[in-house]
């Protein structure tokens, strides 16, 4: 049976992740409060941030920036968005 969490991002009970996606306290917090579906949404946004801002993931400052963004995305009311990104129209 899948582990269920009350997802802080989707505001509903949903399937939880199988393991903490990050080390440390932030990873535990995400594992306990974020669903697989919400994490998948973050990964898409993270990819856009990396690409649009041309982040070099070998640079510790880029990694710190993304850690702050993931915390803002789930727990502080919104992370940065890719500059100039316009979501596709709803069908």
Swiss-Prot record:
Highest taxon listed in the record's lineage: Bacteria
UniProt keyword Mitochondrion, yes or no: no
Pfam families per UniProt: Iron_traffic
Single GO molecular function: iron ion binding
GO BP, one annotated term: cellular response to oxidative stress
Xref: Gene3D superfamilies: Fe(II) trafficking protein YggX
SUPFAM superfamilies assigned: YggX-like
Keywords of this entry: Iron
GO cellular component terms, semicolon-separated: cytosol
InterPro entries reported in the protein's UniProt record: Fe_traffick_prot_YggX (IPR007457), Fe_traffick_prot_YggX_sf (IPR036766)
Family affiliation: Belongs to the Fe(2+)-trafficking protein family.
Function: Could be a mediator in iron transactions between iron acquisition and iron-requiring processes, such as synthesis and/or repair of Fe-S clusters in biosynthetic enzymes.
Protein name: Probable Fe(2+)-trafficking protein
Source organism: Polynucleobacter necessarius subsp. necessarius (strain STIR1)
Source species taxonomy: Bacteria, Pseudomonadati, Pseudomonadota, Betaproteobacteria, Burkholderiales
């Amino acid at each position: 049976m899948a582990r269920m969490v009350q997802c802080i991002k989707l505001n509903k009970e949903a399937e939880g992740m199988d393991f903490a996606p990050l080390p440390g306290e932030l990873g535990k917090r995400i594992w306990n409060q974020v669903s697989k579906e919400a994490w998948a949404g973050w990964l898409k946004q993270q990819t856009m941030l990396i690409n649009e801002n041309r982040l070099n993931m070998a640079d510790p400052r880029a990694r710190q920036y993304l850690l702050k963004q993931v915390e803002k995305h789930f727990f502080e009311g919104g992370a940065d968005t890719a500059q100039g990104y316009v979501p596709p129209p709803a069908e």
